[in-house]
Swiss-Prot record:
Region spans: Disordered: 83-110, 329-476
Main location: nucleus
Record organism: Saccharomyces cerevisiae (strain ATCC 204508 / S288c) (Baker's yeast)
Alphabetized SMART domains for the sequence: KH, ZnF_C2HC
Gene3D superfamilies in the record: 6.10.140.1790, K Homology domain, type 1, Zinc finger, CCHC-type
Record keyword Phosphoprotein present: yes
UniProt KW keywords: Metal-binding, mRNA processing, mRNA splicing, Nucleus, Phosphoprotein, Repeat, RNA-binding, Zinc, Zinc-finger
Primary role: Required for pre-spliceosome formation, which is the first step of pre-mRNA splicing. 2 commitment complexes, CC1 and CC2, have been defined. CC1 is a basal complex dependent only on the 5'-splice site. CC2 is a complex of lower mobility and is dependent on a branchpoint as well as a 5'-splice site region. This protein is involved in CC2 formation where it binds to the snRNP U1-associated protein PRP40, bridging the U1 snRNP-associated 5'-splice site and the MSL5-associated branch point 3' intron splice site. Involved in nuclear retention of pre-mRNA.
Other notes: Present with 4380 molecules/cell in log phase SD medium.
Zinc finger (CCHC-type): 271-288, 297-314
Protein name per the record: Branchpoint-bridging protein
GO process terms (BP): mRNA splicing, via spliceosome; regulation of mRNA splicing, via spliceosome; spliceosomal complex assembly
S-S bonds: none
Residues bearing PTM Phosphoserine: S93, S95, S382
Length: 476
């Protein structure tokens, strides 16, 4: 009996031990470090003076501020104790390619990347705490950086047809410079697609040829507020480019206009509207413009409606203006612009005859004697020319008829003949005092004979002295 009892107890113990071993068996895919007690956990709670359990009632803003302070303290303890190694995971993401400095040391190890991540997180939390928590004091080992940077990724994969780089840069980079002035931060376009193909790397700033990240805007500033403002201005341009219909993007049209100004190809008339005097529209777009009645306009050349006489394309424009009886397409004769008057009521303003109508059989025009157009009466017989009567003018007092002549010295005048008796006038003038006969000419020069039929002296005395104060012609 005792033996059976011992055996039964032995087998029961064996069975229980096998069950315990079976329960204690660890699967091969389980990370044992996750189930072990963290040795640094006690140190974290020992250095962190903030309690993790809150018994009182807090508002939402107070809870958020308490979380920020607790996380800042937690990160500070990890950095002090060098507990910045992430938990080992079997299925983790692949590590980036190694990067080395000038001394050949690797700068992107696993620990360095995790430490940099914790430091960036603490910097952001400290900036938030300084603004929201009064009398907040940063940790002792905290050093505020001189510049902050962040990335805004552009949705190129969702909208491949939109030229985001061109909209952000603008004509010759003016849009990007304007964004930097508005946000007071430096904005650079980096990532895949930010550099044109064939661009030399020496002409670009450092980091511009890093094509590992997708297309993004790298924003650098000296405060977190400026970083957020820079992200917002970049986001506004991307949203406007995505939501605006084609051809209605005001930003793109403004950039094209500015580019035309820079190239000198902008053609814009800044003159005001001649109708209302405003500059925001053209004359044909003026709201005060009155459209004329085209059907009420009649051409004076062809007689048709719809156009002015100066715009008429009729062949009658090439016809002679003197052909007043010509007609075009059986229309009314072309009317002259001259004003016609009734000769009966206005005899003075009757049309004049043309100089080309000398051979016309029409009777000459007759005007009344009181009209200013009436011909002047013929002069009386007393107004007959002196040349027709062959009478020399009376010399002035003190001059003789022999010395008063219109001839040229040294040249004999042509012979003068008296007109026939039938043509002589019935009246004659008496000779001047001291003269018995009328002298017709002066004596010829010495050595020359007179004209045929006349004597050499011509009835004059060559030796007769000249009047006092006068000298004779040369050679006399």
């Amino acid at each position: 009996m005792s033996f059976r009892r011992i055996n039964s107890r032995y087998f029961e113990n064996r069975k229980g031990s096998s069950m315990e071993e079976k329960k204690a068996k660890v699967p091969p895919n389980v990370n044992l470090s996750l189930w072990r007690k963290n040795t640094v956990e006690s140190d974290v709670h020992r250095f962190n003076s903030l309690p993790s359990k809150i018994s009182g009632a807090l508002t939402r803003e107070q809870i958020y501020s308490y979380q920020v302070m607790f996380r800042i303290q937690e990160i500070t303890i990890k950095l002090r104790t060098n507990d910045f190694v992430p938990p080992s995971r079997k299925n983790r993401s692949p590590s980036p390619p190694p990067v080395y400095d000038a001394q050949g040391k690797r700068t992107n190890t696993r620990e360095q990347r995790y430490r940099k991540k914790l430091e960036d997180e603490r910097i952001k939390l400290v900036e938030i705490a300084l603004k929201t928590i009064p009398y907040f004091v940063p940790p002792d080992d905290y050093k505020r950086p001189t510049k902050f940077q962040d990335k805004y990724y552009i949705p190129v994969d969702q909208y491949p047809d939109v030229n985001f780089v061109g909209l952000l840069l603008g004509p010759r980079g003016r849009t990007l410079r304007k964004l930097q002035e508005d946000s007071n931060c430096k904005i650079a376009i980096r990532g895949r697609g930010s550099v044109k193909e064939g661009k030399n790397a020496s002409d670009l700033p450092p980091g511009a040829m890093n094509f590992e990240d997708p297309l993004h805007c790298l924003i650098i500033a000296d405060s977190e507020d400026k970083i957020q403002k820079g992200i917002k201005v970049c986001q506004n341009i991307v949203i406007k480019a995505v939501t605006s219909p084609e051809g209605q993007n005001d930003l793109k049209r403004g950039q094209l206009r500015e580019l035309a100004e820079l190239n000198g190809t902008l053609r814009e008339d800044n003159r005001p509207c001649p109708i209302c005097g405003l500059k925001d529209h053209k004359r044909y777009d003026c709201p005060n413009r009155k459209i004329p009645n085209i059907q009420g306009i009649v051409c004076k050349i062809c007689g048709q409606t719809g156009h002015f006489s100066r715009d008429c394309n009729s062949s009658s424009q090439r016809m002679s203006r003197f052909d007043r009886n010509a007609t075009v397409n059986n229309s009314a004769p072309i009317q002259s612009n001259d004003v016609h008057y009734n000769s009966n009521t206005h005899p003075i303003q009757a049309p004049k005859r043309s100089r080309y109508d000398n051979n016309s059989t029409e009777p000459p025009l007759k005007f009344p004697a009181s009209s200013r157009y009436a011909p002047s009466p013929s002069p009386p017989a007393s107004h007959i020319s002196r040349q027709a009567q062959n009478v020399t003018p009376t010399p002035p007092p003190g001059l003789t008829s022999s010395s008063f002549s219109s001839g040229v010295p040294g040249i004999a005048p042509p012979p003068l003949q008296s007109p026939p008796e039938s043509e002589q006038p019935k009246f004659s003038l008496p000779p001047p005092p001291g003269m018995t006969t009328v002298q017709s000419s002066i004596a010829p020069p010495p050595g020359l004979s007179g004209p045929p039929g006349f004597s050499n002296n011509m009835g004059n005395d060559i030796n007769k002295p000249t009047p006092p104060g006068l000298q004779g012609p040369p050679g006399l």
